[in-house]
Swiss-Prot record:
Family according to the record: Belongs to the thymidine kinase family.
Gene name of this polypeptide: TK
Molecular function (Gene Ontology), one example: ATP binding
First and last residue of the signal peptide: none
Uppermost EC category: transferase
Lineage: Viruses, Varidnaviria, Bamfordvirae, Nucleocytoviricota, Pokkesviricetes
Gene3D superfamilies the UniProt entry points to: 3.30.60.20, P-loop containing nucleotide triphosphate hydrolases (3.40.50.300)
Presence of keyword Zinc: yes
Gene Ontology BP term (one): thymidine metabolic process
UniProt: Zn(2+) binding residues: 139, 142, 171, 174
Name of the protein this chain belongs to: Thymidine kinase
Domain of life, per lineage: Viruses
Keywords of the record: ATP-binding, DNA synthesis, Kinase, Metal-binding, Nucleotide-binding, Transferase, Zinc
Residues engaged in binding substrate: 114, 158-162
Length: 177
């Protein structure tokens, strides 16, 4: 049995996680691998049939809120890309299952909430990943490297999907002010 591997791409809002996911999947597509990208069904800001970056670059995708619900559609797939991995409750078990089937899994996800706490169980994927990439954004206040996402509203729910109208990428100093 050939084993696949897991590549986890982490970072705050606006750090280029989805852009990197799209870039990596496109490389595999050029090399004629059969690829499938999965997106979180509740993130429909730009549409339901593709993963979009904030600057409207996109790649075709299937939407779901449970990864295992679509596992049977992946038999002929070599590469599985997952965007917004932090929102999937079954992300850890699914990625391990798919990688153990010999497939390459690339996951883009926020590592922390707007409160700088672990987002869902995404950090539990780190010990199972062969490669972990941590991206930084640019602080939208002082323009230094930004490692955190700061919410602009007083809404308290963890799952609040949005872009620049709801979040800033910030450095430590600007997060605390």
């Amino acid at each position: 049995m050939s084993c696949g591997f897991i590549h986890l791409i982490l970072g705050p809002m606006f750090s280029g996680k989805s852009t990197e996911l799209i870039r990596l999947v496109n490389r595999y597509q050029i090399a004629t691998y059969n690829c499938r990208v999965i997106k979180y069904s509740k993130d429909n800001r730009y549409g339901n049939d593709a993963v979009y970056t904030h600057d409207k670059c996109y790649i075709s995708a299937v939407s779901t809120d449970s990864l295992f619900d679509i596992k049977d559609t992946l038999d002929d797939v070599d590469i599985v890309g997952i965007d917004e991995g932090q929102f999937f409750n079954d992300i850890v078990e699914f990625c391990e299952y798919i990688a153990n089937k010999g497939k390459i899994v690339i996951v883009a996800a926020l590592d922390g909430t707007y409160e700088r706490k672990p987002f869902g169980n995404i950090l539990n994927l780190i010990p199972l990943s062969e490669k972990v990439t941590k991206l930084n954004a640019i602080c939208m206040i002082c323009h230094r490297d930004a490692s955190f996402s700061k919410r602009l509203s007083d809404e308290k729910e963890i799952e609040l999907i949005g872009g620049k109208e709801k979040y800033l990428s910030v450095c430590r100093s600007c997060y605390l002010t």
